[in-house]
Regions:
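Residue-level signal for alpha-helical context at structural boundaries
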Residues: 36, 91, 114-117
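Residue-identity detector for threonine
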Residues: 27-28, 58, 94-96, 111
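CN hydrolase (nitrilase-like) catalytic-core segments centered on the catalytic cysteine
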Residues: 1-87
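Cysteine/selenocysteine-centered motifs that mediate thiol-based redox chemistry or coordinate metal-sulfur cofactors
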Residues: 8-12, 96-122
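A short, polar/charged loop-to-alpha-helix boundary motif
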Residues: 84-101
Length: 122
């Protein structure tokens, strides 16, 4: 979540849904988990699903939990609690095209001023 460029690359490659397995801890989770998922969804105008383990206070690493799904507008569509939960959320992938047409952030990038370079495996 902290590496915005990765999500931009995926969006430029046509991603409409990005599934992110992650486990923020109890320090960063409350402050950053939802904020970063909403920002990455909004920045790249795609759905993001953050899949986190449920919280286990007896574990060596205590996960913040709170799996969630954000839409291309950066709105939270579904969010789990800290306890084990099956999170189900209906999404319409055509919504990414509609949002990208309404606010063409990806097309408005100034690639004449900066480049995002990455190497693709062939």
């Amino acid at each position: 979540m902290r590496f915005a460029e990765l999500f931009r690359i995926l969006a430029l490659e046509g991603a409409q849904l990005i599934v992110v397995p992650a486990a923020f801890n109890m320090t960063t989770g409350p402050a950053h988990w939802e904020l970063l998922f909403r920002a990455r969804a909004l920045d790249n105008q795609c759905f993001l699903a953050g899949c986190a383990p449920a919280r286990d206070e007896t574990a060596g690493y205590v996960s913040y939990a709170h799996s969630l799904v954000c839409d291309p507008w950066g709105r939270v569509q579904a969010q789990a609690e800290a306890a084990p939960q099956l999170l189900i959320c209906d999404i319409d992938l055509t919504e990414t095209d509609a949002v990208r047409a309404q606010i063409p952030v990806l097309r408005a990038r100034r690639t004449d001023l900066y480049q995002l370079k990455y190497e693709k495996d062939s």
